[in-house]
Amino acid sequence: MSANCMFNLDNDYIYWKPITYPKALVFISHGAGKHSGRYDELAENISSLGILVFSHDHIGHGRSNGEKMMIDDFGTARGNY
């Protein structure tokens, strides 16, 4: 198996081809009622150190779909991360 792949909870194979290889990967997870854009400056600072930064808007937050701030099942929500 390639180091440039992962599987999601539905067992879908996700592949990417990096242009450069970062020193590390940081995932920024926002809090309730927030969105990933709040961390743009932090992400840029970390990225300038050669570290790959990833974040997303959780379902029901920011630009993602879903009823705002509504999580019916944390098990399902956890599958999105």
From Swiss-Prot:
Family under the similarity heading: Belongs to the poxviridae K6 protein family.
Name of the protein: Protein K6
Entries under SUPFAM superfamilies matching the protein: alpha/beta-Hydrolases (SSF53474)
Disulfide bridge map: none
